[in-house]
A protein has these predicted regions:
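Short aromatic-glycine-(Arg/Gly/Cys) micro-motifs in beta-strand/loop hairpins
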Residues: 5-32, 68
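Short, mixed-charge low-complexity intrinsically disordered segments
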Residues: 35-37, 41-68
Length: 68
């Protein structure tokens, strides 16, 4: 399982992006929330949506969950 985080700061389109901890776009400590360990990004995005309804996977580290 991998560790996933969500960026507390939304993107220009309103999305809060979900990242793996080794992503090159990994948010700074003050700007991220730990989501937990998951087998896939879909479960991590689902968890993120409990806090941020407009959540999306990072295009770089979670491309299969990137929708916008």
């Amino acid at each position: 399982m991998k560790s996933y985080y969500v960026n507390k700061n939304k993107q220009a389109n309103g999305d809060h992006e979900v990242h793996l901890n080794d992503c090159r776009y990994f948010p700074d400590a003050d700007n991220r929330k730990y989501l937990g360990q998951f087998d896939n990004c879909a479960d991590a995005v689902k968890e993120s949506k409990k806090t941020y309804s407009q959540s999306n996977g990072c295009k770089t580290c979670c491309p299969s969950c990137h929708t916008s």
